[in-house]
Amino acid sequence: MGESKTTTGEGFGFYKEYVAGMMAGLATVAVGHPFDTVKVKLQKHNTDVQGLRYKNGLHCASRILQTEGVKGLYRGATSSFMGMAFESSLMFGIYSQAKLFLRGTLPDDGPRPEIIVPSAMFGGAIISFVLCPTELVKCRMQIQGTDSLVPNFRRYNSPLDCAVQTVKNDGVTGIFRGGSATLLRECTGNAVFFTVYEYLRYHIHSRLEDSKLKDGYLVDMGIGVLTGGLGGIACWSAVLPFDVAKTIIQTSSEKATERNPFKVLSSIHKRAGLKGCYAGLGPTIVRAFPANAAAIVAWEFSMKMLGIKRD
């Protein structure tokens, strides 16, 4: 058994992979958004010289719950659901189609990095253009709240208000602030994620080949949880600094703010050291496993329900 591959029928079959990807995105936000809110607040306030410093992710989460309730943890979720549904649909669909194209007539004798990596990076590059504006809105909504340092006159009433005000103040290019950091994060992150996922999935299924546990929804779900979760941890461990830079760039209200992610990280390192470049590591890693596990389980289950055969 080689790397995971999909086989669809004629007609609507081509689009089924994109539908399955959309379901993966919805599952990701439902499970992971509260952790993401904590991560963004830590990245915004714990890297600012004059920022409110939270002791850790748990302290940040407790402050949000005390001042805003559970609703505060899902601040900005509307744009996340919309963005992630579309983004995941594109990511999983493009990744699957790119693999089919690059594999061609090559023998299916195991995962091939020369197929997985470019397929994942290509998908990551495409979705970065979708993610950049939606994540800018999400991040700006997330840093607001009772416990925020954002002045009241700079706050937004809704995701739509945030998008409109951003375009009004900064022009159309303003909504794509942080595009370079998003591109770096998505290309690198997806290459790491799918490489770990494919190799783990291949080796686990290889060991179960002659086992009675080979088939079954619970077995497939368990493998999906493990491979997706570990892939998510590997991905975010590799790209968190790019994500920190993206958050700083996107949440700044100043037009003249530095937008080169490497220069932003250099500045953060001077102020807060390596720890500053990994601000939000705790909630990010805690979120990475369940959120990405949910994405893979939802993706694989949806494909099975849609009649997409996977080897």
Curated annotation (Swiss-Prot):
Q: Report the locations given in the UniProt record.
A: Mitochondrion inner membrane
Tissues of expression: High expression in flowers and siliques. Lower expression in leaves and stems.
What GO molecular function annotations does the UniProt record carry, in alphabetical order? L-histidine transmembrane transporter activity; L-lysine transmembrane transporter activity
Signal peptide bounds: none
Keyword annotations of the record: Membrane, Mitochondrion, Mitochondrion inner membrane, Repeat, Transmembrane, Transmembrane helix, Transport
Q: Give the pH dependence of activity as annotated.
A: Optimum pH is 7.0-9.0.
Q: Which domain of life is it from?
A: Eukaryota
Q: Report the InterPro entries cross-referenced here.
A: Mitochondrial_Carrier, Mitochondrial_sb/sol_carrier, Mt_carrier_dom_sf
Family from the record: Belongs to the mitochondrial carrier (TC 2.A.29) family.
Which protein is depicted?
Mitochondrial arginine transporter BAC1
What is the scientific name of the source organism?
Answer: Arabidopsis thaliana
The beginning of the lineage is: Eukaryota, Viridiplantae, Streptophyta, Embryophyta, Tracheophyta
The gene name reads BAC1
